[in-house]
Amino acid sequence: MKLLVFGISYKTAPISLRERVIFSPENINIALNNLLKKSDILGGVILSTCNRTEVYLSIKNFYKAKKIIILWLYKFFNDLKIKEIKNNFYSYIDNYAVSHLMRVTSGLDSMILGEHQILSQVKSAFFRSLKNKNISIDLQKLFESAFSVAKKIRSETKIGSYSISIPYIICVLLKKIFISFTEIKVMLIGSGTINELIAKQLFKYKIKDLFISNRTIDHAKNLAIKVNGCVVEFNEIFKNLNKMQVIITSTYSRKLIITYKIIKSIIEKNKNKKIIFIDISIPRNIDKKIKKITGVHLYTLEDLKDLITNNLEKRKNAATLAENIIKKESIKFMSHIKGYYSSEIIKKYRFQINKLKKIYEKKALLELKLGNNPENIIKKLTYKLTNRLVHKPTKLLYNTSCSKNNKDLYDLYNKLKIDL
């Protein structure tokens, strides 16, 4: 048996092609069952996400299996051409397949280096195949090993600790400034995707008070419900600024929302007031001149980028350590699986010999019951059993002798000979 990965990812194909090769929850089992009808395919797992579609298989022959998979994909996805499959799909066999799965589950092959969401996606794919009895023992061992390696990498390299998402970086920044999140009030201006992610991250950190403001009041209300926040009407923003410790803006406004003049006025009325402004809008929503005001600190995307770059470097260093772990673990797995196959073959061989022994033993016991001569029975038993056991080795020796290479013949003899 061999292990094979056949797939497509963001590295090898544009989204216009990837979106045509996505298995839905409704058709994924049907697709895999169709593939497993082929005698050369012994087991399989389909992983289908927005960034990759991969088929992990246990197979008999690489070249036959590859032809089967290409034809299977072509038939299953009506608008997919054979040429597109050959030009954009990759394949990995045995130890390369093992290393690839370990890299995928550990987030090393992800668009965002080290992201952990892929691990749960791979687990879902594995358990789906396990539930439907579509998985072979070698594939099961491979996936279980990959999950163990992913856990080891996260534990030993801390690759997941160095987040590079803006919401997380903002929280890291605020943690450096404030002792506790439970004592600060934050206002988010804008309720788009990025501010929603920031709001959810702040909610996880148990922020004391979270205020949401947006030009469309319903959008602000919807987000506030999700994070247990309060709504501030857009035209009421400036009345509430003096109550806040942190203001984060992310809107599509092409004009400045927070000006130097407004903030100067607020600070003059509230002596010793300190406010943190974080502007992640493009174009910027906050006048950069407010940095000149005592007690005011402004952070923009450029400032956050430095933190992101720093964390990305840490991730890359962690990834190097992770690659070393995978190299060792993939070798260990291949050694283990080869040992497993060997032991299974040996068990099978010994079972056959034992079965043969029982057949002749049964015949001999029957003859003894009939009162036949015991000495003749034993001679007959050993003669027949010996002939059966040495038939194939003798044939092998004869065929080797016909090759006119005496060294091969003597090497084989030395391997087959019985030590007395």
Swiss-Prot record:
<feature type="active site" description="Nucleophile">
    <location>
        <position position="50"/>
    </location>
</feature>
<dbReference type="InterPro" id="IPR000343">
    <property type="entry name" value="4pyrrol_synth_GluRdtase"/>
</dbReference>
<dbReference type="GO" id="GO:0008883">
    <property type="term" value="F:glutamyl-tRNA reductase activity"/>
</dbReference>
<dbReference type="InterPro" id="IPR036453">
    <property type="entry name" value="GluRdtase_dimer_dom_sf"/>
</dbReference>
<dbReference type="InterPro" id="IPR036291">
    <property type="entry name" value="NAD(P)-bd_dom_sf"/>
</dbReference>
<keyword id="KW-0521">NADP</keyword>
<feature type="binding site">
    <location>
        <begin position="190"/>
        <end position="195"/>
    </location>
    <ligand>
        <name>NADP(+)</name>
    </ligand>
</feature>
<dbReference type="Pfam" id="PF00745">
    <property type="entry name" value="GlutR_dimer"/>
</dbReference>
<feature type="binding site">
    <location>
        <begin position="49"/>
        <end position="52"/>
    </location>
    <ligand>
        <name>substrate</name>
    </ligand>
</feature>
<dbReference type="InterPro" id="IPR018214">
    <property type="entry name" value="GluRdtase_CS"/>
</dbReference>
<dbReference type="Pfam" id="PF05201">
    <property type="entry name" value="GlutR_N"/>
</dbReference>
<feature type="binding site">
    <location>
        <position position="110"/>
    </location>
    <ligand>
        <name>substrate</name>
    </ligand>
</feature>
<feature type="site" description="Important for activity">
    <location>
        <position position="100"/>
    </location>
</feature>
<comment type="pathway">
    <text>Porphyrin-containing compound metabolism; protoporphyrin-IX biosynthesis; 5-aminolevulinate from L-glutamyl-tRNA(Glu): step 1/2.</text>
</comment>
<dbReference type="InterPro" id="IPR036343">
    <property type="entry name" value="GluRdtase_N_sf"/>
</dbReference>
<feature type="binding site">
    <location>
        <begin position="115"/>
        <end position="117"/>
    </location>
    <ligand>
        <name>substrate</name>
    </ligand>
</feature>
<dbReference type="GO" id="GO:0019353">
    <property type="term" value="P:protoporphyrinogen IX biosynthetic process from glutamate"/>
</dbReference>
<dbReference type="InterPro" id="IPR015896">
    <property type="entry name" value="4pyrrol_synth_GluRdtase_dimer"/>
</dbReference>
<keyword id="KW-0627">Porphyrin biosynthesis</keyword>
<dbReference type="InterPro" id="IPR006151">
    <property type="entry name" value="Shikm_DH/Glu-tRNA_Rdtase"/>
</dbReference>
<feature type="binding site">
    <location>
        <position position="121"/>
    </location>
    <ligand>
        <name>substrate</name>
    </ligand>
</feature>
<keyword id="KW-0560">Oxidoreductase</keyword>
<comment type="function">
    <text>Catalyzes the NADPH-dependent reduction of glutamyl-tRNA(Glu) to glutamate 1-semialdehyde (GSA).</text>
</comment>
<dbReference type="GO" id="GO:0050661">
    <property type="term" value="F:NADP binding"/>
</dbReference>
<comment type="similarity">
    <text>Belongs to the glutamyl-tRNA reductase family.</text>
</comment>
<comment type="subunit">
    <text>Homodimer.</text>
</comment>
<protein>
    <recommendedName>
        <fullName>Glutamyl-tRNA reductase</fullName>
        <ecNumber>1.2.1.70</ecNumber>
    </recommendedName>
</protein>
<dbReference type="InterPro" id="IPR015895">
    <property type="entry name" value="4pyrrol_synth_GluRdtase_N"/>
</dbReference>
<dbReference type="Pfam" id="PF01488">
    <property type="entry name" value="Shikimate_DH"/>
</dbReference>
